[in-house]
Amino acid sequence: MIWCLRLTVLSLIISQGADGRRKPEVVSVVGRAGESAVLGCDLLPPAGHPPLHVIEWLRFGFLLPIFIQFGLYSPRIDPDYVGRVRLQTGASLQIEGLRVEDQGWYECRVLFLDQHSPEQDFANGSWVHLTVNSPPQFQETPPLVLEVKELEAVTLRCVARGSPQPYVTWKFRGQDLGKGQGQVQVQNGTLWIRRVERGSAGDYTCQASSSEGSITHATQLLVLGPPVIVVPPSNSTVNSSQDVSLACRAEAYPANLTYSWFQDGVNVFHISRLQSRVRILVDGSLWLQATQPDDAGHYTCVPSNGFLHPPSASAYLTVLYPAQVTVMPPETPLPTGMRGVIRCPVRANPPLLFVTWTKDGQALQLDKFPGWSLGPEGSLIIALGNENALGEYSCTPYNSLGTAGPSPVTQVLLKAPPAFIDQPKEEYFQEVGRELLIPCSARGDPPPIVSWAKVGRGLQGQAQVDSNNSLVLRPLTKEAQGRWECSASNAVARVTTSTNVYVLGTSPHVVTNVSVVPLPKGANVSWEPGFDGGYLQRFSVWYTPLAKRPDRAHHDWVSLAVPIGATHLLVPGLQAHAQYQFSVLAQNKLGSGPFSEIVLSIPEGLPTTPAAPGLPPTEIPPPLSPPRGLVAVRTPRGVLLHWDPPELIPGRLDGYILEGRQGSQGWEILDQGVAGTEIQLLVPGLIKDVLYEFRLVAFADSYVSDPSNVANISTSGLEVYPSRTQLPGLLPQPVLAGVVGGVCFLGVAVLVSILAACLMNRRRAARRHRKRLRQDPPLIFSPRGKSGSHSAPGSGSPDSVTKFKLQGSPVPSLRQSLLWGEPARPPSPHPDSPLGRGPLPLEPICRGPDGRFVMGPTVAPSQEKLCLERSEPRTSAKRLAQSFDCSSSSPSGVPQPLCITDISPVGQPLAAVPSPLPGPGPLLQYLSLPFFREMNVDGDWPPLEEPTPAPPPDFMDSQPCPTSSFLPPPDSPPANLRAVLPGTLMGVGVSSEPPYTALADWTLRERVLPGLLSAAPRGSLTSQSSGRGSASFLRPPSTAPSAGGSYLSPAPGDTSSWASGPERWPRREHVVTVSKRRNTSVDENYEWDSEFPGDMELLETWHPGLASSRTHPELEPELGVKTPEESCLLNPTHAAGPEARCAALREEFLAFRRRRDATRARLPAYQQSISYPEQATLL
């Protein structure tokens, strides 16, 4: 801003000069501070009275003029100039009491009031520059006294001003510091001490000088810190009982010093024998009165002023006294039969000169006791402890100051020395990691103390001593090998024994005593082997030359194998007068041991013969230069290296050494026997896809050249030897091999798991198949005719359920049979089965006259067919009702009597088989529907798949049963009653008509059966048994109306169905509750419940229904028919009650099963591999 104003003023001056009115003048006025100065202005006319005008004085940098005078009025003066300015001789301004602040630019202006031209209103004078000279003055100075902690930094700053500007300098203790040096630096009047020390304390003077004068300022720097010992104590010697003074003086700031004295590290006031005889003076000196021999030692002075780490100074005090005995024991034991010593505890200063002994009050004469002598410290040595040594002894020591007197008497006693009871063996061999116990025990008087120690290096933390003083090494480590010493000591003597421990199963131990004998261009290395660790060890000698020049790196170590059993090796081919390092390494099958210590050696040169003196050589033989122009070329055989021989060869070239490396790895010697005459070399055995670097080193005589230039080449795409690829960017080969092995193992494991799973599934399927084969042969329900009976409304009993085991269907396609009515084809017989030549019929089983199960005679096919034709009218309605009558739990109709023609699995001879098996009846087709697939109670239902042809059952007999009654005949003829029963089965035969579907059968049953079972609500084929062993399953939907739903039938309103498509039966939402069902089972634990109404109950309820049954014209032909099957179930033998009848039935059936099993055992078993879902087995 000031420069801008100055430029403005100059521009105004220049512009005014350009106007031509008056040329401005610049005047400089110099004054001293406190004096006066006149600033001239000649704008007024020199003579006459000037016109009316106004005088103004302006100062550059001020907004208003500092002085304004108009006529005779009082001037207007700036407050800073009040009382110090006035006009003199016209318009000149006089300033009194000049100040430094008055220095600057001033301008004089005069305004003439009679001028009418605006351009001539003002007459400006020249600018005047006022300079005020003043002596130097300090604007900033450091304090007079400054305290600074030791080792801290401090800054002393002096700032002065004046006109002209003064120059500031610093002085320390009267000496000019200049620019400073070391820790002290001076710059622009500022003194900076980086690290204050004790010597930095003192007076620092700041001086500001100029032409107007000089001024100074002094600062005292005080360094706060621990004291500094100025006068330390010195070593002193004093006779016993004299006083002594040890000086100690220190300086410090602050000066609140406290002195402390210590003897051998203990405060003198804490030592009881010194408390009353010691004083510490004001100046820090130690005063010790009446010194004693125990007062000798190191004394330390420690001054302190509260700062940390106070200094200290020490001195040694020597006290002279005559020789004296310290403490003589009252008894001295000596070992019997061993060497003993009677000691005389002496102290003396000056040193001891001699000791005299007395025995039993008489002077001891050593020449009378052979083997007795005096030791260097005056002890009495007895070679053999016996009765001659017994007695009372006293000693008197002497030095240059005399003696303090004889010692007290000591009584010599004979004691038994320690003796080992259990000594360790000379050596122990034990495997590493196991436990080793070495015994050692001793006895003596007094009992000795047994201790163990390892000779040489100690073994801390691994060796323990048990309660029996035995050494326990647990676990045994390699470091435990060595010599161990067991010592037993008591007050009489100390005895020792030792043993060697060898640890087996470790790497070799380090070799020792390695020595190298230099030879011409070689060296002979020898050593002493260490323990081999229990295995054969081999040695190798390692050596390397030291670098001749510091800028060259060390060569790699070279190893030479040592023949087995040798402990020395001759290392040839070394450079003479070159320093080598040698080391020996031992190895065995477990690994390498540590290297031995490194030994340096310099091989000698070849012996030379004296040569004739000649002229001194003018040139030094040229050194060996490196090979030149090394290049690498790819060829089909590998990598070919080509080079030129060295340019400088001192003599004959011995050969080359080829070195190579992969990428940035270390250099390796590839071939060290390249002949010196070769200029090219084929390098086989390289790795694919790797960048190689090669170089050559030449050697001749004792010279080894520097490496040649480096030749780079890549083996990418080159077939080399051996052909393998390395992946340096991915994984190392060991890691890669491990990864590949792990992947292969995982694949094999997965494959084995899959095979095991398949094998287990096959075994599980085989076990299920064998389980089915071991089960009882199925009881086949063979329909003998067509059922065309009427039914009456009623409720069926849910208390009895007949179990079905669904088996494989002989029909190739049940769906096709049901939809199109195609006749079922018999299954293809197994080619290896004896049944392949024809079906094997089943024998009928029925009751005999005595009520036992017996085999009945077979019925001829013609008779069966005739029976079937007579019992079944050939109407479409009868065809639709061909399915077997299976009543559900709902009252769909009167259940029809069931005729089991033959439940025996015992087959007739093959020659007796008259005809093939009949085709599957409507009941079997009905049971093969998907609804009955869900009713499997044994868990063996096969999956829904296309049935394959399978061999037929072992035997199925179609002969009607002979008549056998369970109950006594009723009053009315049973034949008539049985004749009127609808649905009586006449026989089994193969019909030429197509089979009826289950849908037609169910529709006919709904129309015919409801009127027949109004008074006979017995259990049906699908009702549940009251026995706890029975299993429930789903049934077809009920056809009887009911208000509630059954737990075995779908709920009302349910839109789901148990059949679908063409197999769907008409749905009827009729169910009965469980609470309305009757229990008709003779035993709740017996599962052979009756599937039909009881005989007595049927006879009682049948008479009212006879008349009503006549109303059905379609049943007239069946009323007078009497078939052999009717006697199978409708003529039971009378029993006293349900329990007795059930027990009798069970016993009879078990007897039948035993006979059947015996018969089956004599027949070949047929392996049925596929079950038929359209056959039902009654359990």
From Swiss-Prot:
<feature type="compositionally biased region" description="Low complexity">
    <location>
        <begin position="785"/>
        <end position="800"/>
    </location>
</feature>
<dbReference type="GO" id="GO:0050807">
    <property type="term" value="P:regulation of synapse organization"/>
</dbReference>
<keyword id="KW-0770">Synapse</keyword>
<keyword id="KW-0221">Differentiation</keyword>
<dbReference type="InterPro" id="IPR036179">
    <property type="entry name" value="Ig-like_dom_sf"/>
</dbReference>
<dbReference type="GO" id="GO:0030424">
    <property type="term" value="C:axon"/>
</dbReference>
<feature type="topological domain" description="Cytoplasmic">
    <location>
        <begin position="756"/>
        <end position="1179"/>
    </location>
</feature>
<dbReference type="GO" id="GO:0090128">
    <property type="term" value="P:regulation of synapse maturation"/>
</dbReference>
<feature type="domain" description="Ig-like 3">
    <location>
        <begin position="226"/>
        <end position="318"/>
    </location>
</feature>
<feature type="glycosylation site" description="N-linked (GlcNAc...) asparagine">
    <location>
        <position position="524"/>
    </location>
</feature>
<keyword id="KW-0325">Glycoprotein</keyword>
<comment type="function">
    <text>Functions in dendrite outgrowth and synapse maturation.</text>
</comment>
<keyword id="KW-1003">Cell membrane</keyword>
<keyword id="KW-0472">Membrane</keyword>
<feature type="disulfide bond">
    <location>
        <begin position="440"/>
        <end position="486"/>
    </location>
</feature>
<feature type="modified residue" description="Phosphoserine">
    <location>
        <position position="809"/>
    </location>
</feature>
<feature type="domain" description="Fibronectin type-III 1">
    <location>
        <begin position="507"/>
        <end position="611"/>
    </location>
</feature>
<dbReference type="Pfam" id="PF00041">
    <property type="entry name" value="fn3"/>
</dbReference>
<keyword id="KW-0812">Transmembrane</keyword>
<feature type="domain" description="Fibronectin type-III 2">
    <location>
        <begin position="623"/>
        <end position="718"/>
    </location>
</feature>
<dbReference type="InterPro" id="IPR013783">
    <property type="entry name" value="Ig-like_fold"/>
</dbReference>
<feature type="disulfide bond">
    <location>
        <begin position="158"/>
        <end position="206"/>
    </location>
</feature>
<feature type="glycosylation site" description="N-linked (GlcNAc...) asparagine">
    <location>
        <position position="239"/>
    </location>
</feature>
<feature type="region of interest" description="Disordered">
    <location>
        <begin position="767"/>
        <end position="807"/>
    </location>
</feature>
<keyword id="KW-0597">Phosphoprotein</keyword>
<dbReference type="InterPro" id="IPR003961">
    <property type="entry name" value="FN3_dom"/>
</dbReference>
<feature type="region of interest" description="Disordered">
    <location>
        <begin position="819"/>
        <end position="842"/>
    </location>
</feature>
<feature type="region of interest" description="Disordered">
    <location>
        <begin position="942"/>
        <end position="974"/>
    </location>
</feature>
<feature type="transmembrane region" description="Helical">
    <location>
        <begin position="735"/>
        <end position="755"/>
    </location>
</feature>
<comment type="subunit">
    <text>Interacts with MAGI2 and SHANK1.</text>
</comment>
<keyword id="KW-0393">Immunoglobulin domain</keyword>
<protein>
    <recommendedName>
        <fullName>Protein turtle homolog A</fullName>
    </recommendedName>
</protein>
<feature type="glycosylation site" description="N-linked (GlcNAc...) asparagine">
    <location>
        <position position="188"/>
    </location>
</feature>
<feature type="signal peptide">
    <location>
        <begin position="1"/>
        <end position="20"/>
    </location>
</feature>
<dbReference type="GO" id="GO:0060077">
    <property type="term" value="C:inhibitory synapse"/>
</dbReference>
<dbReference type="GO" id="GO:0098978">
    <property type="term" value="C:glutamatergic synapse"/>
</dbReference>
<feature type="domain" description="Ig-like 2">
    <location>
        <begin position="136"/>
        <end position="216"/>
    </location>
</feature>
<dbReference type="InterPro" id="IPR003598">
    <property type="entry name" value="Ig_sub2"/>
</dbReference>
<feature type="short sequence motif" description="PDZ-binding">
    <location>
        <begin position="1177"/>
        <end position="1179"/>
    </location>
</feature>
<feature type="disulfide bond">
    <location>
        <begin position="344"/>
        <end position="395"/>
    </location>
</feature>
<keyword id="KW-1015">Disulfide bond</keyword>
<dbReference type="InterPro" id="IPR051170">
    <property type="entry name" value="Neural/epithelial_adhesion"/>
</dbReference>
